[in-house]
Amino acid sequence: MVCHHKGMTTDFFVDIWSDVVCPFCYLGFRQFHDALDLFDNAEDVVIRHHAFELDPHAELTHGQSLNEMLAEKYSMSLERAAAMNQRVEDTARELGMEWSLVDARPTNTFNAHRVIALAATHGLQEAMLERLFRAYFSEGLVISDHDTLGTLAHEIGIDGVDEMLAGNQFVDAVRHDESLAAKIGLTGVPALILDGRVHVSGAQGSSAMLEALEDAWSQRSQQTA
């Protein structure tokens, strides 16, 4: 699962684990790319996205809203859950994104990750990931629905999703990503590993992301000096 940012001379891998229904993953996605725009060595960056399921046992069709699910999961009032989601929406708006979490439909994300893996074979991994983020957080689409996944993939130039989902393609790829996360000890997302040496957890902001990129590059330079 690889996305080349630009033409590279020396690969500087950035491995990112995320789930498409994780708000902080979408925030972190945008923050990382804002940081990358300011990183002097961005042309050497190779982005590798990896699958992570926050709830592998989530149902395909979920009757609860995101607010209701959050309230139940953390034993809080519906009003408090709504207020928490509003704060997240406000943060997204500061990054130029318009979310509607009241319309978000919690669902299983395994097949969405398979579609992202398919997109990677076309060099469209990040485009697919971002499209799924937007579908879930801004458009209230059910991103486990096969027709929806096929439509979203077609929008960015990928066909054959129905046939892929009917079989077992990319099942092993998703499971491999999740096994690797467990082996590394990752328990939450977003999780970034920069050049195999600097770890970043959570959506810490573009400034922190840029600092981490520069730190990893500095360590790399010292090692090769």
Language-model features: locations:
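Short intrinsically disordered, low-complexity coil segments enriched in acidic
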Residues: 1-2, 90
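C-terminal cap of thioredoxin/glutaredoxin-like
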Residues: 3-17, 24-41, 49, 116-225
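Structural alpha/beta surface segment adjacent to cysteine/selenocysteine redox centers
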Residues: 29-136
